[in-house]
Amino acid sequence: MSQSRQFKFGKDPSFTFKFLRRSAPNGSLHTSASASSWWLALARNAIYFALGALGLTSEDEVLVPAYICAAAVEPIRAYGAKPVFYGINKDCSADLLDIERKIGPCARALLFVHYFGFPNRNIRELRSLCDLRNLLLIEDCAHVLCGETDGVPLGQLGDVAVFSFRKFLPIINGAELRLNRQVESMSIKLRREAFTSTLKHAVNLAEQRWPPISSAIKPLSNVAKFLHRASSQQSQEGPAQQAEVLHGNSETRFDPGVLYSPMSRLSRWIMAHTDMEAVVERRRDNYFKLADALHEISGVEMLFPKLPAGVCPWTLPLTFEGLSYVHKLLRERGIPAVAWDAVRPQELGGAQFHDADFLYENLFFLPVHQNLEPHHLDEMVSVIKNVRHSTRSRPLARNLG
């Protein structure tokens, strides 16, 4: 079932001219890569290359938070390093004592996350700890479009940083690997994007932007797909190396076939011409309005009740007191709520981390993206009120999974 038929509105932003500028302004957010950064298809690919840039080997361990999407763990395993999980508290802060316990003789790096676009609560302590224990710091900014902490922009505190722009923009793919320290040598030989791939992306975007014309351009779509398949089959690299990642892909596995895929031309163009300030302003405004309304609902607890200046939220994360897997109830009612219960890393079974288990089972995320209008926010609040009312008489901690 398509997203438009299942939900009352989209989980992710769709393409619109409203947030485009005619020319790419100088100095805007994330408009160009540099000698110390690379534009890639996926953030998980950036994590893989980050390990190589930092000189890790297959004998090294990477400390990883126990609350994380499996897509961020798979590249560590694929690289050959060993992920070692550390505890996360219910407010998404790091269990610093558990980190200390997990630093063994093979520990080489520590990965931390700026959850949902908000500065990590322990960033200074983690930086100091890594400096003290001679660990490399990997800053996962996959939920970040912009923001700072103590005057330092997010993405500049780790030895490397990883961004995922397709979480914020209506693009096919798009991620960045940023190096903040000198390395002996770093070269990523990305494949050139075939014209047929660019054409296919353009057709997909047109179908997304104007669904009624899908039937009219179906012949063009079929031609684009045929040419792309033919190009892949004729390539010396083989079809597996011509694989693509499309916007909205929920796969968490690490696919070597797309490892050397660049950020697409169309994605780069949209990103360069997007009015980032307008996107940030709309997302912040939606967050403020939604948070104000949710404050009035008994039993609803937001992970971040306040939105700091300069932060661009990815989503609005929250829990229902005493009720697990609420996102499933909301999705049944047409609200595209999301949770990480289905993307928990395979190693995290058996109640090893109780607070992380709570987050996987109880924390869910509401969209606040730039395409949402006031009536969409009102719809979310109305459904949440109804769900809260209908579950108020149920036993506490009821499991809906």
Residue ranges of model-derived segments:
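Short, solvent-exposed loop/turn segments at secondary-structure junctions
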Residues: N45-A46, I68-A70, D91, F116-F118, ...
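Conserved PLP-anchoring active-site segment centered on the Schiff-base-forming lysine
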Residues: A50-P105, L330
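A generic structural signal for well-ordered alpha-helical segments
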Residues: I76, C130, L154, L294-H295, ...
